[in-house]
């Protein structure tokens, strides 16, 4: 199949390898709740990056592969090893080979790895592509989707043994994450998510009445 090209917001976008990559992630994103973040996140990057000049191939690849190291079958099963696990370092090691098998442009791999290295809120993105990905990933941790992603980890993630652990994480997110957004577009997108997030926490506190456990 010849490489299909289109132009969106001034960016040259290729599609030939994308279906292969998305299918690889769909099959590897386990447990099942690990899938869904990737297509939602990519859709968010298009909104966050609207009007900016950037390489969408780089953002797409990083979006689908940045969390490779948190998938079952890729991360350690031993709880002590898992507590020390660096999922970013794992992804940086494995992603070049995966992209090569998908037929991705090898000249863009370094840019993809830069996005993956700096996609977390604590990181300092060094490119417009990594800034877009990081902002979009922060947005995915806020609002209704952010709440669902956190609560589904209770009893399945070593960080969330109880509902109180999840509530504390959600409270920390609404306090700390909005201020880490770099782009004005991201801040605008965050407003409704922040409202939903705060209303949920207030309702949770009222209904649990100190008995969330």
Feature map (PLM): residue ranges:
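Divalent metal-dependent phosphate-bond-processing catalytic cores, especially two-metal-ion Mg2+/Mn2+ enzymes
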Residues: 2-12, 27-54, 65, 75, ...
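Short glycine-enriched, charge-decorated loop/helix-capping segments at active-site entrances
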Residues: 77-82
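An active-site-proximal "capping" alpha-helix that borders the catalytic cofactor pocket
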Residues: 41, 85-101
């Amino acid at each position: 199949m010849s490489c299909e090209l289109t132009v969106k917001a001034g960016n040259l976008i290729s599609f030939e390898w994308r279906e292969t990559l998305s299918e690889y992630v769909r099959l590897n994103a386990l447990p099942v709740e690990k899938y869904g973040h990737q297509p939602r996140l990519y859709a968010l990057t298009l909104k966050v990056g609207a009007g900016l000049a950037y390489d969408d191939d780089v953002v797409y690849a990083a979006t689908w592969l940045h969390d490779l190291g948190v998938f079952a079958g890729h991360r350690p099963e031993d709880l002590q090893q898992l507590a020390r696990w660096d999922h970013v370092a794992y992804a940086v090691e494995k992603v070049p080979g995966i992209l090569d098998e998908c037929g991705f442009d090898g000249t863009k791999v370094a840019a993809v790895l830069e996005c993956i290295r700096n996609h977390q809120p604590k990181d300092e993105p060094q490119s417009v592509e990594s800034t877009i990905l990081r902002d979009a990933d922060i947005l995915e941790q806020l609002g209704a989707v952010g709440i669902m992603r956190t609560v589904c980890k209770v009893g399945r993630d070593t960080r969330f043994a109880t509902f109180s652990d999840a509530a504390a994480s959600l409270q920390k997110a609404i306090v700390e994450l909005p201020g880490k957004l770099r782009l004005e577009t991201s801040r605008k997108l965050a407003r409704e998510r922040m409202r939903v997030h705060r209303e949920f926490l207030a309702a949770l506190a009222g209904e649990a009445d100190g008995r969330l456990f």
